[in-house]
A protein has these predicted regions:
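An amphipathic, aromatic/His-enriched active-site/gating alpha helix that lines ligand/cofactor pockets
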Residues: 24-37, 56-89
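A broad, structure-centric signal for solvent-exposed, well-ordered loop/edge residues
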Residues: 17, 48-49, 88
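Short, well-ordered beta-strand segments in beta-rich or mixed alpha/beta enzyme
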Residues: 2-8, 40-68
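Short, surface-exposed ligand-recognition loops at beta-strand->loop->(often short) alpha-helix junctions
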Residues: 9-22
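Short, flexible segments with low predicted structural confidence
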Residues: 1-3, 18, 34-35
Length: 89
């Protein structure tokens, strides 16, 4: 399984708008993409505030999160992570 992690730092004062964009735009687009099995939103309300979207894929994703038209994020990045099983031997 492949996990894609998208992380974005939210512009001060735009946290609620940023989370709403991820919920209403980004998650549905990801879930409608071929191979996407699940999506999970994580938030950090400290300084700086940030939003993380974890998506799980059965194939290497061909997916770009893009950015909304408004200024919600000061920085965003994505990376693919491969899941490994723990070795308890």
């Amino acid at each position: 399984m492949i996990v894609r992690m998208w992380e974005a730092v939210v512009v001060p004062g735009r946290f609620d708008d940023a989370v709403e964009w991820v919920r209403r735009d980004l998650v549905p687009r990801a879930l409608l993409s071929e191979g996407c099995l699940a999506a999970e939103i994580l938030v950090h309300e400290g300084t700086p505030e940030s939003v993380v979207l974890l998506t799980r894929w059965d194939v290497a994703p061909v997916f770009e999160e893009g950015v909304p038209d408004s200024e919600l994020f000061s920085r965003a990045r994505a990376q693919h992570l491969q899941t490994l099983r723990p070795d308890f031997t």
